[in-house]
Amino acid sequence: MFGGEGVRMRGILIVLAVAAASAGAPSLAATPAQERAFVDTYRKAFEAKDAATLHSLLYTKGADPKALGFYRMMTTVGMGAKVASIALVDLTPEDRARADRSMPGVDGKMLRLSLEPVKKLVIRVETKTADATSTGTNEVFVGEHDGKLWIPVPAPAP
């Protein structure tokens, strides 16, 4: 007699539990405005040779100290050059596979990105001299934590 009602009631409770959990969960996708702000901040800091602002975009919680030093150095290489183009782009399946892998650090310890990437920042820099013009392209993964976009620095792998 209560078999059908029990199944229906259980289904309603599951739907309510999922809805309640979803309502309190943080959004995992950055808004277009947040993405623009991140890209604009990076571009302005890079072109202005503002290392402090570039370093403030690094997610350093739990970061391996040597990896952090490397990332700080890499974010400032070429500072002051003209950014020809800069964009946050969706990850390809290959990017996701690469980001999920542990990698050996300088001292041989295994490291992983400290945040799961949601996009990658692709920066094309143009350097002009009296004799020539050259361009270079760099890519870096971008993750999200507490509603903010970050460049995740590798941390010790679990």
Task: Put a short name on every predicted segment.
Residues 24-52, 56, 60:
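Short, low-complexity N-terminal intrinsically disordered segments enriched in polar/charged residues
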Residues 7, 29, 125-127:
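A detector of low-complexity, intrinsically disordered, Ser/Thr/Gly/Pro/Ala-rich segments
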Residues 14-23:
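Bacterial N-terminal signal peptides
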Residues 37, 52-118:
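Short solvent-exposed beta->alpha transition segments
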Residues 4-6, 39, 68:
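General helical secondary-structure elements
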Residues 93-158:
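Exposed beta-sheet edge and beta->alpha loop/turn motif
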Residues 2-13:
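Positively charged n-region of N-terminal signal peptides that target proteins for export
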